[in-house]
């Protein structure tokens, strides 16, 4: 029995030591992570490192719709697109909070979509950022105050947080600094395109709360906030109405470009039903900037 106890203690000590070592190595790698275009690297750069006068937030629709260089050329302000595939308003709020700890953008552009607001992407905001727990303060605070006890307990383990990160970390270091402005152009164009309707939109309470938090932060910091729905062949009428009513009630600048005639329905302006091609993004961004300047 004594031998079993001693072996158990030794194994536990080895596991603790291994966990500490994994944490030290992984944190060092993340702290010095090159500016790669890999999704996970994009998340780290957006949350930890990037600074610009104009911060663009949203999901993949925003990432493929807003061209930072056009903002810079027109407004003479630096711009970064922090849009992230499959991520919701909670993630957008965490990015903004993280930026405000190191800089203050002059303008925030928030591209919206139904999956950012209906709860279907909520888990991604926690799971895809877990390597930043105990590194990024807004994310750590979110987990510690909003997530279930089981999640908080798991987050104390470095092995849990970093168990699937080494592959993308190595890829990022292999790719090296690419000095990305966040925009991800799409050049493939479909042969045909039809509208895809969505029904049954219901806003998620916590995501709406974080959308309001973004508005509050921008007002408190004197940041100009612009919200928009980009041109789209994925049509959610209920979501469009809800966002328009919400922005009106909150007194927020909002434009619905879903059927923007300069972009929709021309097939070469789209890469698929839900994302603009680079050609479409260039056209749309110019229209958006023009509308911004008329405020």
Say what each PLM segment does.
Residues 3-24:
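Hydrophobic membrane-insertion alpha-helices, especially the h-region
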Residues 25-45:
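Alpha-helical transmembrane signal-anchor/signal-peptide segments
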Residues 86-90, 202-205, 231-239:
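Acidic-and-aromatic substrate-binding clefts and catalytic sites of carbohydrate-active enzymes
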Residues 125-223:
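Secreted/periplasmic serine-hydrolase-like ester/acetyl group-modifying domain
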Residues 241-242, 246-295:
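C-terminal regions of proteins
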